[in-house]
Amino acid sequence: MKIDVKKMKLDLLLGALGALLMVVGDLSLSIIHSDNSDRGLYVREAYMNGSYQLWRPVLLFATGLIGMFFYSFGIKAMIDQIDPKCRKLRAIMKYGGLAYICTGAALHFFIGTLSYWMTVFSAEFGRETAIRLVDDYYSRFMPAASIAYPFIALLLLGSFISIVSNRTILPRKMLLFNILSWQLILVLVPDIHQMISTNITTMDYVMSQSSGNQAAVIMFVSQFIWLTRNEKKFEQ
């Protein structure tokens, strides 16, 4: 299978940059003081006591828009790694990736607005009213925002299956660095910690809220390194 190694390496680097920018946005939500009363995405003490800075969701919005643009290059690299003979698989990845790029930034921003409204409403109307208003906002808009999740699933499963079935340029050992593998790890670790301990830590939020984007950074960077080490094989 012939590939343009230099172009794919560039696409992987740009994809890693995009995912890293998305992580920055995730961290703007999760790197705050944790409290035992925290629950879910937005009922957090730091939002309600006024210590959360409102420039953070703005940063999330900006890095999300730019990040999804660069992320698209990483998705292109994922598609280009698949054998051209596997047209259906490539089509699934292509259209799933296109839909994710279109919806991912909106979902990212929506999650960010939860912190903004909880902070503003708590200051204006008090905690109980703020929780009630944001609960209503979340229940109304989350079903629509969830449109992004099936496309994310297509990308994750498509990438994993393509390597398992040996339909890409990547060896099966690269499953160790696949986005699905690492996302599961980053989600399960805080879940296991919360089963063992009742205390929710900031690190639990960091790992769970940015799991998908951290996993993407790991995957894109590891594939770049693997491609660099095996570059001569594709030049022959």
Task: Go through each PLM region and give its residues.
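Hydrophobic, aromatic-enriched alpha-helical segments typical of multi-pass transmembrane helices
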Residues: 1-236
